[in-house]
Each structure stands twice: as C-alpha cells, then as structure tokens.
C-alpha cells in the first residue's frame, strides 16, 4: 500500500503539469518534450487552422540597415508564462510578445552581434 501512495504522489504532479498551457522551460518542460496536452486541434479540424498573428523580429530592421549583419539559421523555442511569450533572436535580442495578438511588449538588445557572436 505504501508503494502505491508514493507512486500516486509522484505521478499526480506530472499529470497536472501536462494540463498547464504554460511553457516555463525550454521546449515546454524539463524533459524538453515540446508537447502540450491540448485537444483544441485534432484530425477533424486541423484543415481549418489559420494563422492568428505573426511577429517580426527586430533583427529584420537591423539587417536592412546593415547588410553586414547575418542572422544565420538560428531557431528559438519560446517560453510562455501567462499571456506572454519570451523569445531570443539570432542577433541576440530578447523579446516579450503578447500571446493574444503578437504585439511586442518589450525588447532588449544584448548587442552580441557587435562582437561577432
């Protein structure tokens, strides 16, 4: 009986974590599963999915102004807390984006590109 209670105690937090829609860690969870247990999109409605919003990285304007900057093929996995997405860009910006409408809340320029990193 004691083993069963311990097992339930360890499994319950894992089940609750998958029901949460926040992605507070890289790739969703400490195991980097990139999985969210949501049933909003499924085989019967996937054809009807549309883009809700898009976001333009501040890197785009920087490259237009300075063609020597190269944003490489960097791909970031954002984290989501509440209604805010946090993402980094290939030129080292960090941004907070509204999950509701894709509007930029704030950006921070780390200037790592200045040192060629």
Language-model-derived ranges and their functions:
Residues 8-17:
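Hydrophobic h-region of N-terminal signal peptides that target proteins for export
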Residues 1-7:
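Sec-dependent signal peptide recognition
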Residues 18-58:
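Blade/loop signatures of beta-propeller domains
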Residues 23-27, 69-93, 117:
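Repeat-blade elements of multi-bladed beta-propeller folds
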Residues 51, 103-107:
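Predominantly a core beta-strand signature of beta-propeller blades
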Residues 55-77, 107-117:
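Extracytoplasmic beta-rich repeat domains
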Residues 98-101:
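Short loop/turn segments that connect beta-strands within beta-propeller blades
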């Amino acid at each position: 009986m004691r083993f069963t209670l311990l097992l339930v105690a360890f499994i319950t937090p894992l089940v609750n974590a998958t029901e949460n829609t926040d992605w507070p860690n890289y790739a969703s969870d400490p195991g980097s599963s990139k999985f969210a247990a949501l049933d909003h999109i499924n085989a019967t409605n996937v054809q009807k999915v549309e883009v809700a919003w898009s976001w333009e990285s501040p890197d785009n304007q920087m490259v237009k102004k300075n063609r020597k900057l190269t944003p490489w093929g960097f791909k970031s996995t954002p984290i989501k807390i509440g209604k805010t997405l946090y993402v980094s860009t290939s030129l080292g910006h960090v941004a907070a984006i509204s999950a509701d409408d894709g509007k930029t809340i704030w950006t921070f320029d780390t200037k790592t590109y200045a040192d060629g990193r």
